Amino acid sequence: MTRLCAVAAAVCVLAAAGMAQTGAPKYQKLTITEKFYCEGAYFGDFNKDGKMDVVSGPFWYEGPDFQKKHEYRPVKEYQPTGYSDNFLTFCADFNGDGWMDVFCVPFPGAEGFWFENNQGKDGPWPKHSALKGVDGESPCWGDVNGDGRPDLICCNGGFYGYATYDPAKGDQPWKFVPVTPKGRYSRYAHGQGFGDINGDGKVDLLESGAWWEQPKEAKAGEPWVRHAYPFAGAAAQLLVYDVDGDGLNDVVTAVQCHGYGLVWHKQVRDEKGQISFKQNVILPPNPDLKGSELRISQLHALEVADVNGDGVPDVLTGKRFWAHGPKGDKEPSAPAVVYWFIVNRDKAKGVTFTPVMVDDNSGVGTQVAACDLNGDKVPDVIVGNKKGTFIFLSK
């Protein structure tokens, strides 16, 4: 038995034990396709039948069984040794017509387009330019400005900020709002995130080495307040939520999304209310490569959802297979796993994360999505990456 196989076998035992102890669901794996179209899949009700559908690459798949597919844009298959033109996918009604549309986050630095739902008609969906350059490898989707609509958190033209759309002007490009001075925010910038760090009700933005505080009255063109802190060397998505239940939002992130390490940063405040963080290790950034402890390289996508129904959000992540091809990064051909890390709050032991494996032959891309697809109130898992498109339905 090879060392990787031995590690994988040990991991399977741990995963089974984790499911039993944490109340995490078992999953049915649906292999939608083994072709590489994208590295980020998402969800939405595209035909208004009340059932959640899935979009991955050039197709959307009808729920609840996801067997019937519809081509909404031209099909192009990619080789897994390279990259696709679709790094992440997000959905919303971009033109206010009541139908769910699709936005494709492109290869970093390229122009981003959204595709207008054709309302059940045959043929490709109309294509609209959203943003001339979508920079960064982990753009996020969340309401930054408080208007009730999701914004695209990304870099653009050397700035970090967010792009907004106006459904009343669906044919117009999106507006990018910088929150930083112009700097080294390149097309390959690692680490984007959002959330209310200081508890003032305003959404702040995060990067690998800092968080940016949104002013009470943000003015266009004025940078937000920067607070330096080393969350990661090269993060993917930075998740912001209250991990330990103390009322303060913490940060969960990969340490190096092309290497190893998963950590959470506990928010702490001094007697004057100044904010700092204390790092806690979930998976070590420098694991023993000869040991049997769980290690996952290329944690290039993270999501948060309550998978076991205990009211505490858990972390969903996994390996991005061949992030830099078959010879790049650490252990590029190790099992492409998907994991939940179940959060347990214990007054005596503090916070612990129990790993529960969803699958060992799919992995994540630059995105992984969690959504209740089958109506059982348990988050299901959606993946589009170099191995194909996969849906994991709780059962």
Give residue spans per PLM region.
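N-terminal secretory signal peptides that target proteins for export/translocation
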Residues: 1-2
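Bacterial N-terminal signal peptides
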Residues: 5-17
